[in-house]
Every structure is written in structure tokens, then in C-alpha cells.
């Protein structure tokens, strides 16, 4: 495991990097690009858990994402301090770990449809229950069909930040490879040649067939280990994104429920 590669500041679609002397670090730039994106702003009207609440107290996906990012920044800085001391890293600081985890956390729900997992189920159903949806599937390869029959907000999120937001740029928002790798909790496509590897990182998929080459480029920059054709080991800091999300929804969602009693 090479932490210098895992914290790669390379950006897909860009051949140059910002000089270190600038006031903002690359990971802070990632955070700012996400904050000011229209895709992130759209989370303000998407349900976290409780839809159509008449109370302005209840969280939306937007406020949830901000809270997860705040927790992720703290977790990243704490883990970063330990990693730096253990591995003797030079030129890297705990706040760099905090900033990159915060950026990935900020975008972690950016691909979720309205109504969350229920929205994912509705999209999957449409492709089998409607004539129009079935007609779309007929024009796709077997592997591509699985992208829709198993529609996944995590994969849609990867597509949004790397293609749909700023579509004229290769790499979309052109976030750093480190942020993209940490964002991708499920580093595999919707189909694999054999049985998927065991483990939490492979229970879902994190990118569409059409985005496989781009993620392979990101994984190569980060030095992520291939575990099967079309699947890689998870970036170690991705576990902090998941932890921050769990901490927030297991406490805050209960708080919202209590408020709505």
C-alpha cells in the first residue's frame, strides 16, 4: 500500500496540477467544486428518510451530506495523523486526509434519485414493467442491461461527477483521483465474469459499464489492487466515508423521527 499513490492529486482530463504554493490544496478544490455544482444543489429537495415533511427541521439529502462531510473530515484527520506517523510520510498532513475524505463524503449521495432506495427500486421496475423501458433494454448488451435492471445510485453518482456535471470536460468535474477513489465505495461494475469477490465492498456496484475505462484509469493512478476482471480493492479511506454516513444516519435519522412524533 503506497499512500503517496493513494493520495494522488492527478485529475482525469487534466495534464497539469496546481502548484502546492497556492492557498487552496487540491482536495479543498475538490470540495469547493462539489459545493458549487448544480448536482449537489439538487440534493436540497431529495428525501433523506422522511419525505414531504411539513417541518423545516427535518434533514434533506443536502443537509445530511453536509453533516456526513463534517464527520468525515474529523475521522480523516484523526486517521491521517496515525498513518503519517506510522509510515513516516513527508509533505502530507492530517488536514489533507481530512479534506479529501470530506470531499468524498460531500458527494456520497449525489447520485441518489428522489425518495432514495425506493427511487432506485422504481427505476429498476420501470425497465421491466413498461413497454418503453423494455424497448430500451433490447438495444443494449447483456452487461449494459444490468446497469439498469440493478440501477444503483452509487454508480449514478460516479457518472454525475465524472461526466454529466461539466460534460464538455473529460472527467466531468475533474476531481482528483484520490477523491474519486474514496468516493467509490463499491469498486466493481454491475456484472463480473465469475462470482463477485466476497466482502462488503462488492455487494453493490460503483460504476456503469460505460464508465469502466475511466475507473480503471483512476484505480491505476491510486495503485488499487485488481481482485477480478472489472473489480478492484476498495480505497482504505472509503471505509471512513461509510463510517461517517453510518454515524450520521444512525443518530440523526432517529432524531428526525423523534421530532416528527
Which stretches of residues belong to each language-model region?
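Sequence-structural signature of the catalytic-core scaffold of metal-dependent phosphohydrolases
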Residues: 1-23, 35-45, 66, 70-71, ...
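A short small-residue
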Residues: 46-56
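Low-complexity, highly charged intrinsically disordered N-terminal segments
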Residues: 59-63
Amino acid at each position: 500500500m503506497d499512500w503517496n499513490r493513494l493520495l494522488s492529486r492527478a485529475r482525469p482530463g487534466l495534464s497539469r496540477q496546481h502548484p502546492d504554493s497556492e492557498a487552496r490544496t487540491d482536495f479543498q478544490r475538490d470540495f469547493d467544486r462539489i459545493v458549487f455544482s448544480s448536482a449537489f444543489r439538487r440534493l436540497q429537495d431529495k428525501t433523506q428518510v422522511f419525505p414531504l415533511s411539513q417541518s423545516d427541521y427535518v434533514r434533506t439529502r443536502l443537509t445530511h451530506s453536509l453533516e456526513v462531510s463534517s464527520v468525515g473530515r474529523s475521522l480523516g484527520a484523526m486517521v491521517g495523523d496515525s498513518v503519517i506517523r506510522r509510515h513516516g510520510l513527508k509533505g502530507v498532513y492530517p488536514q489533507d486526509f481530512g479534506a479529501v475524505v470530506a470531499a468524498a463524503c460531500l458527494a456520497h449521495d449525489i447520485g441518489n434519485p428522489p425518495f432514495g432506495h425506493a427511487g432506485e427500486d422504481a427505476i429498476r421496475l420501470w425497465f421491466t414493467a413498461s413497454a418503453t423501458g423494455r424497448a430500451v433494454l433490447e438495444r443494449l448488451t447483456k452487461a449494459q442491461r444490468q446497469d439498469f435492471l440493478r440501477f444503483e445510485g452509487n454508480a449514478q453518482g460516479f457518472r454525475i461527477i465524472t461526466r454529466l456535471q461539466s460534460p464538455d470536460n473529460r472527467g466531468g468535474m475533474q476531481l482528483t483521483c484520490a477523491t474519486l477513489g474514496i468516493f467509490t465505495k463499491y469498486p466493481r461494475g454491475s456484472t463480473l465474469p465469475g462470482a463477485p469477490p466476497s466482502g462488503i465492498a462488492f455487494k453493490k456496484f460503483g460504476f456503469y459499464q460505460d464508465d469502466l475505462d475511466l475507473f480503471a484509469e483512476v484505480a491505476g493512478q491510486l495503485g488499487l489492487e485488481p481482485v477480478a476482471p472489472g473489480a478492484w480493492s476498495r480505497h482504505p479511506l472509503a471505509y471512513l466515508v461509510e463510517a461517517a454516513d453510518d454515524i450520521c444516519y444512525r443518530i440523526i435519522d432517529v432524531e428526525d423521527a423523534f421530532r416528527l412524533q
